Amino acid sequence: MLAIISPAKTLDFETKIDGFVFSQPELTAYSQQLIDICKQFSPAEVASLMSISDKLASLNVARFAEWTMEHNEQNAKAALFAFKGDVYTGLEAETLTNAEIDYAQRHLRMLSGLYGLLKPLDLMQPYRLEMGTKLANPKGKDLYHFWDNIITQHLQQAIDAQEDNILVNLASDEYFGAVQAERLTAKIVKPVFLDEKNGKYKVISFYAKKARGMMVRFMLQTQPTSIEQLKAFNYGGYWFDETASTDTELVFKREEQ
């Protein structure tokens, strides 16, 4: 069983991580092509392209300039520990055991606008390049055109290494859009997390993102081998709703917080 998640805009490159054998990202030749395009932009152009502040734009212009194909422990950090958004708050990578991290290396992948697809212990350098960015490139008008079937091919290889051909989609629509799902030989299931608000259950973004991270944590700690076992997820007070679920969507609900 393989899970996929989105990356995060918030990064932590201050905290050092030791005790692991880090891996190299596999698609840096493609990353370099994107960096070469991004290096041509002024801070004002980056601010406009990414809809970010001038301060953030300047930071990312500097990041593009400093990015290098060589990834080592001095200039990079393992992706699982570098990302710090809501999903990763729910995942709590720092409190996982080494055995759980080792399992994650085989059963978890992170989608990325710059790196395409990352394993948890892949070294990455600080960047900001969301998958939805309309970055014109030789292959087309945006990153979906750029990555085309590359991410899908590498994802299939990771799925083929599993014993059950199950892909658990915990990524956002923006990032899963870079996967050509119809080309995958896999049973794809998407957990959906609904929180009660004023008596009605609905997706509340902050809670849903955190729940995706909690589901990854659940998978790393219980090592499920069937969709049935995924339904036992109960972290954070969520429970599986059989009636609201389908073959491809697993619905989990939680009472108002």
Curated annotation (Swiss-Prot):
Superkingdom classification of source: Bacteria
InterPro entries assigned to the protein according to its UniProt record, in alphabetical order: YaaA (IPR005583)
GO terms of biological process kind: response to hydroperoxide
GO CC, any one term: cytosol
NCBIfam families: PRK02101.1-1, PRK02101.1-3
The family this protein is said to belong to: Belongs to the UPF0246 family.
Protein name as catalogued: UPF0246 protein HAPS_0280
Organism: Glaesserella parasuis serovar 5 (strain SH0165) (Haemophilus parasuis)
